[in-house]
Swiss-Prot record:
Gene label: dapH
Keyword Membrane part of the UniProt annotation: no
GO biological process: diaminopimelate biosynthetic process; lysine biosynthetic process via diaminopimelate
Catalytic activity from the UniProt record: (S)-2,3,4,5-tetrahydrodipicolinate + acetyl-CoA + H2O = L-2-acetamido-6-oxoheptanedioate + CoA
Name this polypeptide is given: 2,3,4,5-tetrahydropyridine-2,6-dicarboxylate N-acetyltransferase
Keywords: Acyltransferase, Amino-acid biosynthesis, Diaminopimelate biosynthesis, Lysine biosynthesis, Repeat, Transferase
Source organism: Clostridium botulinum (strain Hall / ATCC 3502 / NCTC 13319 / Type A)
Enzyme class: transferase
Length: 236
């Protein structure tokens, strides 16, 4: 079944209809030689087993063979998850431990996703863009090239409340720590959003906005560019 992931209602339907998954990893010491491991990924040496699979299938094996099991440890990091995480192996970007990136996200060359950042389904992260610690890019949020999304900042998604237009952050924008960009807002090229601002309306190119709600306080000048310049070495 296909879904139009540019439509917030279609994204919601995709999440609703997706098969929910509770994958676990089980480390087991015991005799499981007569078990059926269909649909379970198994690695073993003698009586030592590592199992990867859905919780209900592995837990059935553990329960049926509890008299043969000496030790068991289970690791779990989600429950009834609807959307898998992005396969990051072939992405040419720096993604630090603890970042959470869901499937169907696009990440450009030499982007940086820092610890604790969350990037939701359908989002696009441009080339050379940094999503700093604990920042959030909501569903279908679009960040252009060489953007800096500051620590704890939020780019709202399209799901709740539903919005047909995603947030769009154009190239070379700097968004300060803990700023919030509300649903459907567009930030023009080269602009700066001050830390802690709440942006409720579109922002033109090459201006500085601040406050709650954010207002234009000046145009970007040489001093502003010097204070907000990015470091290429962080993106290598």
């Amino acid at each position: 079944m296909s879904y139009n992931l540019t439509d917030p209602y279609e994204i919601a339907r995709y999440i609703k209809e997706a098969k929910k998954s509770t994958p676990i990893k089980a480390y087991i010491e015991g005799d499981l030689s007569n078990c059926d491991f269909t649909n379970i990924e198994k690695f073993n040496s003698g009586d030592l087993y590592i199992l990867f699979g859905e919780s209900e299938e592995i837990l059935v094996i553990i329960e049926k063979n509890k008299d043969k099991i000496k030790n068991c440890r289970i690791e779990q990091d989600r429950r009834k998850s609807a959307i898998p995480l992005l396969d990051m192996l072939k992405i040419n970007a720096r993604i630090e431990p603890g970042a959470t990136i869901r499937d169907k996200v696009i990440i450009g060359e030499n982007a940086v996703i820092m610890m604790g950042a969350v990037v939701n389904i359908g989002a696009e992260i441009g080339e050379g863009t940094m999503v700093d610690m604990n920042a959030v890019v909501g569903a279908r949020g679009k960040l252009g090239k060489n953007v800096h999304l500051g620590a704890g900042a939020v780019v709202a998604g399209v799901l709740e409340p539903p919005s047909s237009d995603p947030c769009t952050i154009e190239d070379n924008v700097l968004i300060g720590a803990n700023a919030v960009i509300l649903e459907g807002v567009k930030i023009g090229k080269g602009s700066v959003v001050a830390a802690g601002s709440i942006v409720t309306t579109d922002v033109p190119e090459n201006v500085v906005v601040a406050g709650a709600p954010a207002k234009i306080i000046k145009e970007v000048d040489v001093k502003t560019k010097d204070k907000t310049k990015l470091l290429d070495d962080l993106r290598k």
